[in-house]
Structure formats: C-alpha cells, structure tokens
From Swiss-Prot:
Protein name (database record): Malate synthase, glyoxysomal
Localization per record: Glyoxysome
Microbody targeting signal, short sequence motif: residues: 566-568
Gene Ontology cellular-component annotations: glyoxysome
Family: Belongs to the malate synthase family.
Pathway note: Carbohydrate metabolism; glyoxylate cycle; (S)-malate from isocitrate: step 2/2
Primary site of residence: other
C-alpha cells in the first residue's frame, strides 16, 4: 500500500519485537506482549492473516494506485460518473443471494467501538443489529485492537461480562441480543504493530482475519443460524475493491471448510465515487451481500475531497448539508432503488444524538429531530437505520415499526423505480446554503477535541450532545482546508470577511481558550489538546489536502503514544 512508507522498521521501537509470541516465518509483532493477546495472536491465526496478506497485497496496492489515479483526474477537472464499461451490469436483471433469515429484520442497528461495556450494552439494547467497530469509532492503538478481539470472542462465546467498579455493577448479556456485525478498517489503513515479510500488515485483513479465525464456528451456531460471520465494509471507492473482499471471503470460507456464501457483508456507500458503482459493488459481492448503507457523514467528507481542486463546488456550513440537499437525497434514493432491485437491504444513516438527561425540553427537541429523520428514511424505502446511543432505540424502532408493520423489511414493497432516472448531475449537484464564522468555529472546536481524544485512545467521543467519530473530524478538517484554500467569503452572518490564515489563526486561538474553559484547566493540561491543535492546524493549512487525517494521526499513536497505554 502506498501509505506504508512512513511506518518503516527504523521508525518503530524494536524492544520486545515478537518476544513471547509464537510467530510463523515472516511475521513480526511489534506490540507489547500480553498472555491474553497471545491467545488471539496464536501461530495458526497469524498464519491465516499472513496467507491473506500474501495472497491479496498486490491487488490492494493496485487498487490504492487506482485511487490515486482517479484523484489526479478529479484534480485536473474531471468528474466521477457511471462507467460505460459496466453498463451491462447496471442494465441487466440479476439479484444477490437470498438474505439469511437471521438478518432479515434490521430495522434499527446500533453502532459503537469494540469496548467491553459498550459491546454488552449494545447487544442488550433492543436493536436488531450491533455493528462493533474497529474503524471510525476506534482509535487503533495496540491495546484497543487486541482487547477488542478478546471482547468480541467473549461476546460470541456468550461469556462476556464487565464489572464497573465505580458503580459496583456487573454487566452481562441478556437472553435475547442483537445480531453482531463487525466493521474492520478500510483498505488504506496499515497495521503497524504487525509486520509481514518486512512491511506493515493491512489493517482490515488483521481485523477480519483474527475475528473470523476465532469466531466463525461459534457464530454460525449461536447467532447466524448457519450463516456468518457478518461484516460492514467501509470506505470503498470502486467495485474492484469489493472484488478483493469477495475473494478474501471465498478464501476464508475455503480454509475454514464452510459453505461458499456463508460470510455476509453490508457495504457502506460513503465515498462519492462509490455512488456510481453501487450495482457493480453488489455484483462483485452478490454471493456475500446483505446490502448497502448510507454512510452520509463520510459521504460529505468525500464530496469535498473529490472536488478539492474545484472552486465552483464549495460547501456551505456543514450543519446545512443534510439529507434534504438534492445531491444527498438523490444518493439515498438511488441506493434504495439499487438495493431493492438486487434483493438486499438499503440501510439508512446515523442518528448521532445523545440523550440530554439534565434538560428534558432540549432532549425532546433532539428526539423529535431523530423521529423526523427516521420517518423520512422509512417513507423513502429504507429497511433500517443506525443509532449511536441505546436511548434512541425505542424512538427509532417505533417509527420504523409504525410504517413497516410486521414486515421485516421493504425490499419487495418499495421498489423506488422512480429513482431509475436519477442522473450524474443529480448526484453531483452543488449543495446550497451560507457560510458563517460559527461554521468555521464549530469545525475547528470539534475537530481539535475529537483528535485530542483519538490521540489518547478514544475513537467515539461525546461532543455537544452528539456521538462523534472520525467522520466528523474529517468533514471539519477538509471544509476548513477548502475555505482557506479558496478564501471563501463568510456570507451568512453579515460579516462579509474572507477566510485566510490570519483569520483562521485567531479562530484557533480563541477556540482553544473556549475548549480549556469547557473541559477545565486540569483536564486540558493532561489531555493532548495542544498536540491535536498543531496537527489539525497543519492539516487545514497544508498546500495539499491529505487523504485521511487518521493516517497522519496513526503515525503519532504508533510511535509516540503514551507508554502506559500502548506499552510499545
């Protein structure tokens, strides 16, 4: 992968390299040794990961080069669009394999990181599905990744528990739990704690490989009714990337001796190029697919990134870029039509609100916003939706149940053939709205706070009554970068000033003072707010836009992470 050069052998501590771990030839573990971790990182599991890495690394490298080539085209004025070469796939009649009975009903799904208490609460939440996240809701330090694998194994085994010493309460699984999906990292992210043949492993192959190796048999027996495990696949930009996943699944099934098509996955459509590839993505995964999901926050981030060299496509304040914008509604409608035509789920987007326990009026206002958003989704034809907090499950469930009745989904009842005429212009239409100083301030304040939390090991962060993950920081970063690069006028609040480095510097200074007031001096001093501020500011003011904030930040947690947390 093209992004791996920064994680060279000289850049990582050699202390304890593979010490204590029984590793196969060509595999080197750079994370600290732990007896519990060693049970996950046994020789057989590492052989499985090494086989996946060696089999698919050249395909992955080629796909990442294709991403860079597409970026060059867009930066030279090109636009993403439907591929004429695959028109036959879009136009012909075919369907994906039938949806497994275990996941026919997905009307509300909850998401969260692979932390022990979170897993128990999410599985007990009353949602139909829990998506356990190794990606945007997790800071991928060594402890988080390995403990996440241990937690998931215990969850699949049914033995997971958690003793909250502060509340003196023990958490255990209920008799009835949500179905478990797991989201590995995207293709672009390395796993720099594990080297295979002298280069960092591919992060998603480590996440997928360890989880599948240790859990496929128990999962199929206890959760999947003969199917599974189930996955969510993030950040893809082209069907060639889905084809790699399909090949990974087939190889894993063959090595495990289970039936082809057992593994099932939902793909997040969260990049602008992927919206033109939805039929092709489903086609590549047709034996392993259980639908597509509207990853709307990352989709907005991708819109800015794709059009970084297009000054005629500037975004308004990000709070104005909702699902009522024409390009967002078109994306949602086409996703529903595509999925239902191919016989799989069309999943709606995230409700990120957190219950406001100390303000009932504000809480009801927030819940009403959630209900309206979910009503729009179910009436449009979505088969289910996402929530970030257990407190939102009843409201979301009520809306979907009231409109779907006893049907587990709307795959056959909401064809959305009216969306067949949506054009490239519909999907690329510039969003409307104003740009304000408050928009610039909010981006800066939220971006710095999220990054500070990420650097200290937290990937899902409550900020201003919303559960934020990496997507929020990415939108904030790229929008600030876009406004700075093109010197946009803040036309929405009567100020009429243009964004430049001097103005941005003042905003950063003032927002850091506000953050210190809000979190308190002691927490501010102990946290990594200053480091996060430097990194976020550098990213916003760089002459060229980095593809992912987390790639830059990952370099920091692998090499410089506090010793008591990472033990590198």
């Amino acid at each position: 992968m093209g992004s791996l050069g920064m994680y060279s052998e000289s850049g990582l501590t050699k202390k304890g390299s593979s010490r204590g771990y029984d590793v196969p030839e060509g595999v080197d573990i750079r994370g600290r040794y732990d007896e519990e971790f060693a049970k996950i990182l046994n020789k057989e599991a590492l052989l499985f990961i090494a086989d996946l890495q060696r089999t698919f690394r050249n395909h992955i490298k080629y796909s990442m080069e294709c991403r860079r080539e597409a970026k060059r085209r867009y930066n030279e004025g090109g636009l993403p669009g439907f591929d004429p070469a695959t028109k036959y796939i879009r136009d012909s009649e075919w369907t994906c394999a039938p949806v497994p009975p275990a996941v026919a009903d997905r009307r509300v799904e909850i998401t969260g990181p692979v932390e022990r208490k979170m897993i128990i609460n999410a599985l007990n939440s009353g949602a139909k599905v829990f998506m356990a996240d190794f990606e945007d809701a997790l800071s991928p330090n060594w402890e988080n990744l390995m403990r996440g694998q241990i937690n998931l194994k215990d969850a699949v085994d049914g033995t997971i528990s958690f003793h909250d010493r502060v509340r003196n309460r023990v958490y255990k699984l209920n008799d009835r739990t949500a179905k478990l999906f797991v989201r590995p990292r995207g293709w672009h992210l390395p796993e720099a704690h594990i080297f295979i043949d002298g280069e960092p492993a591919t992060g998603c192959l480590v996440d997928f490989g360890l989880y599948f190796f240790h859990n496929h048999a128990n999962f199929r027996r206890s959760q999947g009714q003969g199917y599974g495990p189930f996955f969510y696949l993030p950040k893809m930009e082209h069907s060639r990337e889905a084809k790699i996943w399909n090949s990974v699944f087939e190889r894993a099934e063959k090595m495990a001796g289970i039936e082809r098509g057992s593994i099932r996955a939902t793909v997040l459509i969260e990049t602008l190029p992927a919206v033109f590839q939805m039929n092709e993505i489903l086609y590549e995964l047709r034996d392993h697919s259980v639908g597509l999901n509207c990853g709307r926050w990352d989709y907005i981030f991708s819109y800015v990134k794709t059009f970084q060299a297009h000054p005629d496509r500037l975004l308004p304040d990000r709070v104005l870029v909702g699902m009522t914008q024409h390009f967002m509604r078109s994306y949602s409608d086409l996703l529903i039509r595509t999925c239902h035509r191919r016989g799989v789920h069309a999943m709606g987007g995230m409700a990120a609100q957190i219950p406001i326990r100390d303000d009932p009026k504000a809480n009801e206002v927030a819940l009403e916003l959630v209900r309206k958003d979910k009503l729009r989704e179910v009436k449009a034809g979505h088969d289910g939706t996402w929530a970030a907090h257990p407190g939102l499950i009843p409201a979301c469930m009520e809306v979907f149940t009231n409109n779907m009745g006893n049907a587990p989904n709307q795959i056959r009842s909401m064809r959305r053939d009216d969306a067949a005429n949506l054009t490239e212009e519909d999907l690329l239409q510039q969003p409307r709205g104003v740009r304000t100083m408050e928009g610039l301030r909010l981006n800066t304040r939220v971006g710095i706070q999220y990054l500070a939390a990420w650097l200290t090991g937290a990937g899902s962060v409550p900020l201003y009554n919303l559960a934020e993950d990496a997507a929020t920081a990415e939108i904030s970063r790229v929008q600030n970068w876009q406004w700075l690069k093109y010197g946009v006028e803040l036309d929405g609040d009567g100020l009429g000033v243009r964004v430049n480095k001097e103005l941005f510097g003042r905003v950063v200074e003032e927002e850091m003072e506000r953050i210190e007031r809000e979190v308190g001096k002691e927490r501010f001093k102990k946290g990594m707010y200053k480091e996060a501020c430097k990194m976020f500011t550098r990213q916003c003011t760089a002459p060229n836009l980095d593809d992912f904030l987390t790639l830059d930040a990952y370099n920091y947690i692998v090499i410089h992470h506090p010793r008591e947390l990472s033990k590198l």
